[in-house]
Amino acid sequence: MTMGGVDEGRLARKFWIKFKNESVFIMYSPFFVSLASGTLNSDTFLNCVSQDVHFLKAFAHSYELAEECADDEEDKCAIRKLRKRVKHKLKTLDTLVSEWGFELPEECITNNATLKYTDFLLATASGKVEGEKVLGKIETPFEKTKVAAYTIGAISPCLRLFAFITKEIQPLLDPNDSSHVYKKWIEYYCSENFEELTAQTEELLDKLSVSLTGEELDVIEKLYHQAMKLEVDFYSAQPMVQPTVIPLSWVKDPVEGQLTIFCDFDLTCTAFDSSAILAEIAIVRSQKADPDQSESKLTRMSSADLRNTWGVLSTKYTEEYELCIDSILPSEAGKFDYKGLCEALKQLAEFERKANSRVVESGVLKGLNLEDIKRTGQLLMLQDGCRGFFQKIVKCENYKTDVHVLSYCWCGDLIRSAFSSGDLNVLKVHSNELVYEESISTGDIVKNLESPLEKRQIFNDIVKDRSNNEQNLTVYIGGSPADLLCLLEADIGIVFGSSSSLRRLGEQFGVSFVPLFSGLVEKQKELTNGGSFTWKRMSGTLYTVSSWAEIQAFILGS
């Protein structure tokens, strides 16, 4: 099995997977979105490509230093071959750029972003890591090998980034369209030849790292990550002379505009469903209360009975939910039919109300302690990048933002506690609420939000008082059928995750699901061809992402 072109069970693969989100910020940069669309200003492209001269020179010198540090003759030979390939590319760069359809400027001045990476790489290759001179502390030739490993660790992510990003872009190209001016450049970095070079570099990193200590492997990991971040900085620093559709926050007028973010909670923000979390709180509380029968009036059932009841409720919900979805699907997929979708979702609304009534009647929510809920919420595992995105969005000072969480969750206190740190208490929560008596839940629920139509009503109530000019933009982020109407009503609907129920339901009613990156590439083409920055709500098109890094890169940039 492979991921991003990297084989399993290897150090290079481990690092790539761990820091792959950094590549998202490069891919979603104005530079690469414009390049992928074929509309990137040629001067901007040449300004970037001209920096290859400085990168290649730094690679060549670093390989030379790494070869001196390598202890094994086979490793020395492998490094020498890599250096030879770099020197050949440096020598033939003018010809290569000409084959891509461009001509390098006579003078290639190093920019600051390039200098930061090349200085970092050459310092690493010279044995200076984290501000300390490593070579001065080495006593044997064998120990010098780690400097060679450090050097390759600082080079390999640069190659993998190019291989990965261009392979993401290539499927978006029309094979019959010869007008895409960057097609040859993309094909060069998608080639088997470049993948072979990347793989050889990663294999060398793995081989050089075999004998290293855990502490030394940690150093390589830090160097690998630092190299990735410097690449992000490099592409973020590319001067853009054309209008671009991203980052979204750059497009908005900082004075007149407002960006309103709506978001689901369960499995969009969280790694686990909130009902399962509340079930676990109830069971743990019951186990604590079992020895003391004085609390039985609060818990009402033993922990074993409680676990069994939760299991029955959960199984029944899952089975009947799928049957409900199947029953409301049209026999054939057709054109986008919002009205028909609304009618179908009324049946789902009735199902959700009955399911909630069963939960209340079962008594499983009785006896929950508010402090337990808040403590669990504060420790709740959110999706990677979710908290960081919201922390950045609420602190952004150059435009107005408003953030709302719309959730079926039975307990608003759980959501508020999950966002209680990092200035996130400004997020407005719309959900159901548990009923308490002296901080102990009675088992009842204040049912504020039980259906897709109620979610839509809250959404519309929030946005109805705002003017409809282009500078007021709504973004909805969700991942279940409950979010479908809001996703379609928002200016931009972003589907997080891979809910098969959402896909099946949407597709049968004519909803299109488009990967966000490819949607941005098309939007950039439209903008360059005289289109506007405006996003069209109720278009029947939703945009899919697999990480919060994509959402952050799209809305805020790097």
Predicted regions and their residues:
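Alpha-helical substrate-recognition element adjacent to the catalytic core
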Residues: 247-437
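Active-site nucleophile-adjacent alpha helix/oxyanion-hole segment immediately C-terminal to the catalytic cysteine
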Residues: 61-64, 69-70, 271-278
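Glycine/small-residue-rich interface belts in oligomeric ring/scaffold proteins
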Residues: 48-51, 55-66, 297-305, 310
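C-terminal cap/substrate-recognition subdomain and adjoining C-terminal extension
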Residues: 185-190, 245-256, 376-558
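Acidic active-site catalytic centers that drive phospho-/nucleotidyl reactions
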Residues: 52, 264-266, 479, 483
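Active-site-proximal alpha-helical scaffolds that flank and shape metal-associated catalytic sites
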Residues: 6, 16, 24, 46, ...
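Terminal targeting/low-complexity segments that flank the catalytic cores of oxidoreductases
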Residues: 1-55, 59, 68-72, 169-255
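Eukaryotic N-terminal low-complexity, Ser/Thr- and Lys/Arg-rich leader segments
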Residues: 1-17, 21, 133-140, 239-258, ...
